[in-house]
Curated annotation (Swiss-Prot):
This is Elongation factor P. The lineage of its organism: Bacteria, Pseudomonadati, Thermodesulfobacteriota, Desulfobacteria, Desulfobacterales. The keyword Cell inner membrane does not apply. One of its GO terms (biological process) is peptide biosynthetic process. One of its GO terms (molecular function) is translation elongation factor activity. The keyword Cytoplasm applies. It is found in: Cytoplasm.
Length: 187
């Protein structure tokens, strides 16, 4: 069982028989009364949001989710296809289930696919991915007017703020948790 004090972002638990993932957990200690946790979570089956408050003594059942290592294959319309790296079985996820992770999906990227009752319901990206810069404005050395970052377009279509020395064709590392530039990748 999970105690309310152990709730953190990305904690997966069962509420009313359905799996949820915590998006935000805020500890509130009012001047009078009992302290509580204000929680915002997403239903992993339907994608709907739920906001609830819980007391410190409340307990929860951990979500019975299975994670399988899979590889991204391709997208067709709003369907995304993945392959199990051990059995070569393929699964399909909708654009809704993939969510913002679609900004990081490149061919052959390995990640964990979440399964609930043998049904694929979501993905867990690796913390860092390497993406190629496909469009970047040129940088003039000594140009301090432009500031310390510039927008570039990555191979997935994502637009990201990067340091001015990053050029078109450069491979960069991006943190999938924050969506921020990390470093250039030397190949």
């Amino acid at each position: 069982m999970i105690n309310a004090g152990e709730l953190r972002k990305n904690t997966k638990l069962m509420i009313e028989g359905e799996p949820y993932v915590m998006l935000e957990v805020q500890f509130v200690k009012p001047g009078k009364g009992v302290a509580f946790y204000k929680c915002k979570m997403r239903n992993l089956m339907t994608g709907s949001l739920l906001e609830r408050t819980y007391r410190s003594g409340d307990t929860f059942e951990p979500a019975a989710l299975e994670e399988k290592k899979m590889q991204y294959l391709y997208a067709q319309g709003d369907e995304y296809y993945f392959m199990d790296v051990k059995t070569y079985d393929q699964v399909m996820l909708t654009e809704e289930a993939v969510g913002d992770a679609k900004e990081y999906l490149i061919d052959n990227l390995e990640m964990d696919i979440l399964f609930f009752e043998n049904k694929a319901i979501g993905i867990t990206l690796p913390n860092f991915v390497e993406l190629e810069v496909t469009q970047a404005d040129p940088w003039v050395k000594g140009d301090s007017v432009a500031g310390d970052s510039k927008p570039v377009t990555l191979q997935t279509g994502m637009v990201l703020q990067v340091p001015p020395f990053v050029e078109e064709g450069t491979i960069i590392q991006v943190d999938t948790r924050t969506g921020a530039y990390v470093t250039r990748v030397k190949k």
